[in-house]
C-alpha cells in the first residue's frame, strides 16, 4: 500500500513531460512551415522612428519683417537677417525660396488674394573667382613681350607659364644686344634714352616673344656674317667654294688628292686616270673618277684622240719614260690613296670599263665573294670577246 502514491507521482511527471515534448514539436513544425513554406513570406517590419527636430515656424511678424527687408535689400541675406533679428541667414534663404515658388505658382494659375503681390528681386551676379586658372589667349601675335624681373634674372627661373626655350632665348637676346632692351620694363635699372647705330629696317623691326625665337636669331646672324669659304667633299675630293661671285665655279685654291698629269698615248693596266689641264682656261677642271660604261668611254676617247696624240710628243718630260712596247712606268701616288682606277685592255676598243680594285683585296675577303668575282670577270671577258 505504501508504494502506490510514489508510482502515481512518477506516472504524473512522465505524462507532463510527454505533453511538453509534443507542444515543442508542434511549435517547431509550425515555425518551419512559416519560414520555409511555399511563396508565403512574412513582411519585414520597419523599425519605428520619431521626428525629434521640429520644423521652424515663422510668425506673422517675422514674415512681415522678412517682406519689408526683401523690398529694401533684395537678396542680401545678411542684411535681412539683421532686419528680422530672430532667424539666421540660412533659414531666411530657405524661407525666401519657398515664398518665391509660392508667389510664382499663384501668379500663374491660382488666386492672388492669399499672397500679397510682390516683385521677386533678380538673382545677384556671380562672383568672379579670386584665384582663377591660367587661361589660354586667342592670338599669340597680339601679345606683347614679357618683362623680365630682376629676381628672375638672378635665379634664371621663369615665374610665369612659359617654356624654358623662351626664357633661354630672352637671356641670349639680352647678352647679344646690350644696347637694346625687349621692353621698357625689361631691365632692373630705370629706363634711359638709348640709341643704336643700326640700319633703318633693324630699327623698325619689333621683337616679339615667339615659341621658337632661335630661328630668328640664326637668320639675323647669318645675314650679318661676311661671305665665308665652304669646303665640299665630292667622291674623296675636297673642293673649296667661295660664296662671293660665282658659287658654282671653283677657285684657284681647289686641290685634288690625285696627281695632275697630261694624258699619254697609251695606258697600261696599272695606270691611273689623269687630269687634263687646258691652257686656255685659268681654272682647273677635275674629272670625277666614277665608273663609266664602255660605250661612253669609247666615244669620249675617240673624240679626244687626235688632240692627245699631238700633245703626247711635247709633254714627254712630264710623264714617265716610255718603253719600246708602249708601256709607261708606274708613277708614284700618295699613300693616302688606298683605291685606284684601272683600265682593262680589250681587243676591239682602246678603253674599256673602269675597274675599282682595292689594294687589300688580295689579303682580305671571304671565299664565296672571291669566287663570284672570278665568275663575273670571266663573263665580262666573254662579253668583250663578243664585242
Swiss-Prot record:
Residues 1-17, 27-37, 141-166 have a biased composition (Polar residues). One of its GO terms (molecular function) is DNA-binding transcription factor activity. It is found in: Nucleus. Disruption phenotype: No effect on the regulation of core clock associated genes, but shorter hypocotyl length and higher freezing tolerance. Rve1 and rve2 double mutant has no alteration in the period or phase of the clock. Rve1, rve2 and rve7 triple mutant has no alteration in the period or phase of the clock. Residues 172-200, 312-323 have a biased composition (Low complexity). Residues 124-134 have a biased composition (Basic residues). Residues 77-100 bind DNA. Residues 324-333 have a biased composition (Basic and acidic residues). Its main location: nucleus. CDD domains: SANT. GO terms for biological process: auxin-activated signaling pathway; circadian rhythm; regulation of auxin biosynthetic process; regulation of DNA-templated transcription. It comes from the Eukaryota. Residues 50-104 form the HTH myb-type domain. GO terms for cellular component: nucleus. Induction: Circadian-regulation. Peak of transcript abundance near subjective dawn. Down-regulated and strongly decreased amplitude of circadian oscillation upon cold treatment. Residues 1-44, 105-200, 306-334, 350-387 are annotated as: Disordered. Keywords: Biological rhythms, DNA-binding, Nucleus, Transcription, Transcription regulation. Morning-phased transcription factor integrating the circadian clock and auxin pathways. Binds to the evening element (EE) of promoters. Does not act within the central clock, but regulates free auxin levels in a time-of-day specific manner. Positively regulates the expression of YUC8 during the day, but has no effect during the night. Negative regulator of freezing tolerance. This is Protein REVEILLE 1. It comes from Arabidopsis thaliana (Mouse-ear cress). The lineage of its organism: Eukaryota, Viridiplantae, Streptophyta, Embryophyta, Tracheophyta.
